[in-house]
Amino acid sequence: MNKIYRLKFSKRLNALVAVSELTRGCDHSTEKGSEKPVRTKVRHLALKPLSAILLSLGMASIPQSVLASGLQGMSVVHGTATMQVDGNKTTIRNSVNAIINWKQFNIDQNEMVQFLQESSNSAVFNRVTSDQISQLKGILDSNGQVFLINPNGITIGKDAIINTNGFTASTLDISNENIKARNFTLEQTKDKALAEIVNHGLITVGKDGSVNLIGGKVKNEGVISVNGGSISLLAGQKITISDIINPTITYSIAAPENEAINLGDIFAKGGNINVRAATIRNKGKLSADSVSKDKSGNIVLSAKEGEAEIGGVISAQNQQAKGGKLMITG
């Protein structure tokens, strides 16, 4: 993630927000005007209205000088979806579990794509059918759950902000029939090499939401944050998500080159972190800490081929310093 931003606690929002390093920290003393950054306690990045996030970054509005061009070749294959472009902001209204095929799904640095859905449990499935990778460099916003499926690869840029109620990015494909039947099994596309998914940006989802990054190789160098939900980095050839609202995950790995790497920060406040692959490397931060007295998070690191390089910081405890579960398997 771009290092001109860092996480600070907002007393007004009661959450961590990404802010410019040129700004000062929020007030945590009893004296007015005394400000300092939070350094000792991890708090979640709660799902906020996009305006709050933009204001915290010093972006009161999005420039309208660039015509939105990152989305091309929209074809609705299930359900309904309508698209409206206003300058560099693209708004899509979709029905529950709508499926949209795209020739190109990119979000440029000055662009914003917003999915307006029927409820927080609604989902939209976006699939890229060309041979182009997806590059998300701008803002992706939704009140529901967003799936992005591109077997060619997905890169989330250092200035990107993803702010949804649930987010799944996968370089493994899923058939329309499986989506309609709510059988969320993603697997390698025939005659295609396993592609990589990389996150350099900021991904936040709503309370109890989930973030799933799925591919042949998965790498996080940015910040991922959920509140009571789950974060999964899954590298393999076949992944099944049993329930997209309250996800539990099964997976199979048949190739030793599948690798999951975390060099960034992953926060699951009282939730679950799953990193599963043939090979795992962690040099960043994995935190499932909870401010609740009774609830602790869980962290599972599962290296199917038995190779796990575990460094960085790993923490799962509640307010009473009682630990959650940390499981490392090979």
Describe the function of each predicted region.
Residues 6-9:
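Active-site and channel-lining beta-strand-loop segments
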Residues 2-4, 15, 24, 28-51, ...:
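Extracellular and secretory-pathway beta-repeat/beta-biased strand scaffolds
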Residues 12:
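IQ-motif-like calmodulin-binding regions
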